[in-house]
């Protein structure tokens, strides 16, 4: 039965790939609801699946397809962003304090919690309510008492803002205000639907503990420059900090910030060494190539249209 469901699911997904060629999308009358119905009907995976040593929970009957799509990626590959995952496992140590910014449903939060063990700490920030609910459930499912989740966005100031909800992928919610439907470089569509969320700064949250953080993971869909501004004290005081950043220049620019200034600040003001994590990177046998100029990074992003994953280590004289 399991193999049959997987077969139907693959056939369904293959058929759906033909829709754009026929001029059909989620906005076509009734297409979105029909797609969601069959997506759930053919959903082949268990309620919980083990990924990278931790269990992730999902309830296909009561879960929006956009969250199921995130889980589908994990279930199919048993890994998310393989190269970054392998490096993350190499960098994070037992007893570390890890901060996960843009935690989604908890992939890197769970991985970090497993790596740091009971003597470590993980702080996960996720503002979107449905993502946050699964983040909390997944932490509890694994009895990771060392991990704590907070339904807040990180920014340059404490307050409230709008979070715009992506209509097909829970990893692309953003505080970028869209005009109508925004089409990003890979065909993303962001609806005008928004919710009010709370924002905090990391400097306020970790006041007095700036030097305790070992690793941060940042995936904040364009709010990187704002997040950086809100953790200035941490960056100036913490000599051991290591960072994983998903860098997408186009989204940073849409927030009114300069992607070039963002990289320059990391290189010159905070004296980080910046390394690009290639998709085919093997953490066990390869060394990362250091990137020394803004121009090199922008070239890899192909004129700001693509994102890349970066690893940063502190460089002190």
Predicted regions and their residues:
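Core alpha/beta nucleotide-donor-binding catalytic domains of modification enzymes
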Residues: 136-168
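Conserved Class I S-adenosyl-L-methionine
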Residues: 259-273
């Amino acid at each position: 039965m399991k193999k049959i469901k997987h077969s139907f699911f693959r056939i369904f997904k293959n058929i759906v790939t033909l829709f754009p060629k026929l001029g059909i999308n989620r906005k076509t009358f009734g297409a979105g609801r029909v797609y969601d119905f069959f997506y759930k009907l053919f959903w082949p995976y268990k309620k919980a699946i083990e990924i990278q040593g931790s269990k992730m929970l999902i309830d296909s009957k009561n879960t929006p397809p956009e969250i199921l799509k995130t889980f589908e990626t994990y279930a199919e590959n048993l890994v998310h962003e393989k190269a970054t995952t392998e490096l993350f496992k190499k960098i994070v140590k037992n007893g570390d304090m890890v901060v996960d910014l843009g935690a989604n449903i908890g992939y890197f939060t769970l991985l970090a919690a497993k790596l740091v063990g009971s003597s470590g700490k993980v702080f996960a920030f996720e503002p979107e309510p449905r993502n946050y609910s699964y983040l909390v459930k997944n932490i509890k499912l694994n009895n990771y008492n060392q991990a704590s989740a907070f339904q807040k966005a990180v920014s340059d100031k404490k307050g409230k803002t709008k979070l715009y909800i992506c209509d097909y992928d829970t990893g692309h919610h953003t505080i970028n205000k869209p005009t109508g439907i925004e089409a990003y470089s890979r065909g993303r569509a962001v609806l005008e639907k928004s919710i009010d969320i709370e924002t905090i700064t990391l400097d306020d949250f970790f006041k007095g503990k700036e030097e305790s953080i070992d690793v941060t993971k940042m995936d904040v869909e364009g709010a990187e420059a704002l997040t950086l501004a809100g953790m200035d004290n941490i960056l100036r005081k913490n000599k051991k900090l290591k960072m994983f950043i998903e860098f997408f220049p186009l989204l940073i620019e849409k927030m009114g910030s300069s992607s070039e200034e963002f990289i320059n600040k990391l290189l010159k003001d905070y004296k980080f060494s910046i390394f690009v994590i290639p998709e085919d990177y093997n953490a066990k046998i390869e060394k990362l190539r250091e990137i020394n100029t803004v121009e090199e990074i922008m070239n890899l992003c192909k004129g700001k249209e693509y994102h890349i994953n970066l690893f940063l280590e502190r460089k002190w004289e």
